[in-house]
Amino acid sequence: MEEPGEGLAGGMNVFLLGLLRGLSKRGIATDVLTRATGETVEVSAPFPGVRIFHVPCGWVEPPSRESAFASVDLFVERCRILMRGERIMPCVVSAHYWMSGVAARKLSGAPMILCYHTVEARKVPAPGAGQAPLSPIRREKEAALAREVSRVVCFSEYDLEENRRVLPELSEKGVVIPPGVDERFWHLPPREVARAYLGFPQGGMIFLLAARGDAGKNAAVAVAAFRAMRDRWKGPAIFLVAGQEGPEGASGGDVVFLGSLPHGGMPMLYAAADAVVCPSLYESFGLVPLEALASGVPVVVPEGTYWGDRIRSQGGGLVYPREKPDRFSDALLALASSAELRARLSLEGAAVAAPFTWEKCTASWAGLLASASTPGSPR
């Protein structure tokens, strides 16, 4: 349950903490089994009724999906020992991400609710990137899980429909439960306060990209679009990249890599920014655009994505064709050139984000868990 940007951690961890907090408020006791980074079992209790067991299973630095998959059997073995000792007998299991689904199937015969978060067959490879070593295995396991689990949760109708194309079993098992957005993103400090606190210039444009260092997040394309925009617009501007380290020798200049940041620091970054850039070609949902919209910050997204469709129809940002990088740069230029456009999109964005609450999300999850559970364990 690391912070987004640390190792392989991303928006899924943000979602899980929001869900666990909501389930706790509803009095739903929950045990979470996750990999430990150390050699001993650690237990944390972030919310009443919620226990997170960090189970050692051969953590390797730097972490990789390959090393994580190689540790699944050891993780399962040690989780069995822990579950016996703690007398954990779940009446329903919720698995998040395909490897968690593989482990959960081995650990428990209880009904399983799966949330893929991302599906391998839908991923759009980054330019020049080859097939990931785990890709064939992941596709096989994701297809098997679609057949075996009780229900599959997707975050939007768009995501469910796209997943059905590659996993037809979801036509009968799929259910849509959108995530929520934390209250703190609705109540930001003034821009001048945020910029002074973070040490950024008071004047000029600030574009923000928040994503871990994964080629599929398309950070390089976003930086190139910003550079192209700067060739045509001479006002002051900087481009912030949060969640990843920059290339060697890339320090200084108008592109600033902030490295890994705690999620608690994101509201201040959104408050300082004039626009948030979200160039990833495939997200099952995308919490960063949602947080930015709730914060009243215009977003820039590619078409052919959930947020591309929603923003095109409801506003809150600009959409560009994914195969035309010059149009990406045009969108940045349009935002830099017009305070009136930014103000209009800011108001639209808050309205677009308004339906996404943790109260609705956790109420739906509570109902789904109850409908799938078997009598027995209180957890």
PLM feature spans:
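N-terminal subdomain of nucleotide-sugar transferases
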Residues: M1-V50
